[in-house]
């Protein structure tokens, strides 16, 4: 992987990631394909959305179908018929979300499979091997996602364990030509975040992710941590904010130097009838859309908006039709890619501040005061 930074506007960055499988313009949003599928989307739909890279999940793919099935097809790209780059997360967050079903030790994590209840052990070495078998273009280290809330002591213990696992991940990654990203932890404590980042840069990685955010903390805390880290993150490496978020979170993240994002929100919300538009969120199952013959978003060029009315989408939602979830997802993912494209263009022109003002104004909102603090 090669990362080239082409333009900056304040703390915001525009660049390009180059892989053997293709190029990714940054800042970029990565649709989430947890089980090897972006829910409701054919591979060609993902391409049409403008996405250049997608995300898969090591934890879930390891449990089902298993790497042997994937390898029988070549690798994950061949299995799912997506020939662009793929980032796989290591499974640390999914293990964290198991709660009392898992037991963490220095060696790794022992847990019961949510599929059949069998005992499974996952450690940095296995996480690296699984991602190698999947053929990931970007591999994530195995870490512990610091719980929220966490005291300074609790966050420190978790962060230091993640650093030791980061070193083991790097050693196990070995001669794998794929990029390897470190993950900054430390909870909501700036000093621990700095310590985590320092430890990771001493080990040395191809990119650096910020983990442990979007785990239930107030927006103020997320922005505070991003403000703290934006001047400390290595300038020549890509920066990835994991699991974030709403369109406004992408905008605020980009303003703070983030290059990469992923989140299930556009796909999950689509299936629940919450659709993102230039004018704000549309709840398509609301009765007011029953007779609306207009498009969901007249400014959008997606297949859904170009061909179907709000009334039809409302009808599909009320009937529980699969096509409704599909058309909603096509739109939401295209909307996210449009926002990213607009951000890249604004950075390239040196007009990010104007774009941010316009982004909030077209939704009839004012930018939150906390977002303007640095």
From Swiss-Prot:
One of its GO terms (biological process) is tRNA wobble guanine modification. The keyword Cell division does not apply. SUPFAM superfamilies: tRNA-guanine transglycosylase (SSF51713). The active site is at residues 89, 262. It comes from the Bacteria. It holds the Pfam family TGT. Its EC number is 2.4.2.29. Keywords: Glycosyltransferase, Metal-binding, Queuosine biosynthesis, Transferase, tRNA processing, Zinc. Its cofactor is Zn(2+). GO terms for cellular component: cytosol. One of its GO terms (molecular function) is metal ion binding. Homodimer. Within each dimer, one monomer is responsible for RNA recognition and catalysis, while the other monomer binds to the replacement base PreQ1. This is Queuine tRNA-ribosyltransferase. The gene is tgt.
